[in-house]
């Protein structure tokens, strides 16, 4: 089925059914989204004219046919007009895992001290590496100009970038593998010089372990540090500090950019998030960053909270905003960006596996007074969105900020739709139906 447009004009606030009319207009953004059930990547140019928005769904030329029973797309990242998406299978990588690199067809046009994206070509697959030797990645990050892929079954990770992918004689030569981390790996990379790679172990000698790995020409595994609790899942770098997500709270260390410290000389700092009603320590599973802040969610239902850490502080602590959700709802990892005027905003989906028709989106103004302190963060009234379709780690909503931060685009997996929502008045400005179950979303735009 091709996408059908639901156009909301500026003169009307209600959505009046569907339309197959696609207004000719300027391209606001080029969108890429994953269809979870089909294991395909789709794309469309989001266009805007005086009549409203239009979107026409397309397949990507050369995208591999995956086994929908045993292979899935995982995280994806974009840089310099190149998009990389990870591939994972259900047999520890034996069926075929790895990555696919897509030329987005987008180019940067210089305008004095800034640039604009132009879209002269349709997207196409540049290269791919899917075989039994890629370690079954679950996580693919972007730090600076680097794509960093966790090779879980190989106890290591691969670093590549847009230039290395484009210049490589073969896909196997596009990246460099490093040993570090184990089981189900999460990663932080500091200034392109050092990686912190986690171990997932709950107990034993590798519980709480983080390998510190020098990157570049003189690469080597430097040493490892240990957090006080295990089940590490989550890591990030912000403002000269590296943060980790163990089973209890948050841990952080000063980034060792030269990898000249030793395990004994590194202080692993611990921050508490709080406890649940049974007295168990709260944790998180992933971080996002914006400017000097690390942002994450913790807790469930009425105990849900959006948390922030000011990484620029010498002695950072956890601040939080209570987000009292329904008993069957939980918060997805926040999506962070800049709204109108450059103010930081967090998009927080409250999702219910039992009743996805009740899913909501909270827009949180992180710094209403603009002083750089998030202690005055405030959530707006929730927006009713389409349903999720949660299956394990998949089937969640996603969102991207559109140019100038005045609108966002969101995916609704449960009813196969993509919406455009205003951040000014929180109205739904357009709805588009699409094939399959749209989940993860990436935007190429100004």
Language-model features: locations:
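Post-signal peptide N-terminal segment of secreted/secretory-pathway proteins
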Residues: 42-151, 155-156
């Amino acid at each position: 089925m091709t996408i059908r447009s639901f156009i909301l004009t500026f003169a009307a606030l209600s959505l009046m059914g569907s339309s197959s009319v696609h207004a000719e207009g300027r391209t606001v953004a080029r969108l890429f989204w994953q269809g979870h059930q089909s294991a395909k990547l789709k794309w469309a140019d989001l266009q805007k004219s005086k009549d409203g928005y239009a979107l026409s769904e397309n397949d990507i030329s050369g995208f591999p046919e995956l086994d929908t029973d045993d292979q899935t797309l995982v995280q994806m990242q974009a840089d310099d007009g190149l998009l990389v998406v990870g591939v994972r299978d259900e047999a520890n990588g034996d069926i075929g895992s790895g990555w696919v690199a897509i030329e987005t067809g987008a180019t940067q046009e210089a305008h004095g001290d800034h640039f604009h994206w132009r879209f002269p070509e349709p997207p196409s697959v540049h290269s791919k590496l899917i075989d039994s030797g890629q370690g079954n990645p679950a996580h693919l990050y972007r730090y600076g100009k680097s794509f960093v892929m966790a090779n879980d079954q190989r106890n290591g990770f691969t670093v590549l970038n847009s230039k290395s992918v484009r210049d490589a004689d073969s896909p196997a030569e596009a990246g460099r593998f490093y040993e570090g981390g184990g089981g189900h790996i999460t990663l932080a990379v500091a200034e392109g010089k050092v990686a912190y790679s986690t171990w997932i172990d709950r107990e034993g000698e590798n519980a709480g372990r983080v390998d510190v790995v020098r990157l570049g020409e003189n690469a080597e595994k430097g040493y490892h540090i240990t957090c006080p609790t295990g089940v590490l899942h989550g890591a990030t770098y912000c403002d000269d500090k590296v943060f980790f997500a163990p089973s209890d709270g948050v841990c952080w260390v000063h980034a060792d950019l030269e990898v000249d410290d030793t395990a004994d000389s590194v202080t692993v700092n611990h921050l508490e998030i709080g406890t649940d009603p049974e007295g168990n320590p709260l944790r998180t599973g992933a971080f996002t960053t914006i400017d000097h802040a690390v942002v994450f969610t913790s807790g469930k239902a009425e105990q849900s909270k959006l948390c922030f850490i000011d990484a620029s502080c010498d002695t950072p602590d956890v601040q939080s905003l209570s987000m009292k959700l329904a008993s069957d709802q939980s918060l997805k990892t926040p999506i962070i960006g800049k709204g109108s005027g450059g103010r930081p905003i967090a998009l927080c989906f409250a999702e219910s596996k039992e009743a996805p028709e009740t899913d909501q989106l909270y827009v949180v103004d992180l710094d209403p007074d603009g002083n750089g302190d998030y202690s005055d963060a405030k959530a707006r009234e929730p927006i009713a969105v389409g349903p999720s379709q949660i299956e394990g780690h998949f089937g969640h909503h996603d969102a991207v900020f559109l140019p100038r931060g005045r609108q966002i685009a969101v995916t609704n997996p449960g009813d196969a739709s993509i919406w455009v929502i205003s951040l000014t008045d929180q109205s739904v400005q357009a709805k588009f139906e699409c094939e399959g179950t749209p989940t993860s979303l990436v935007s190429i735009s100004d």
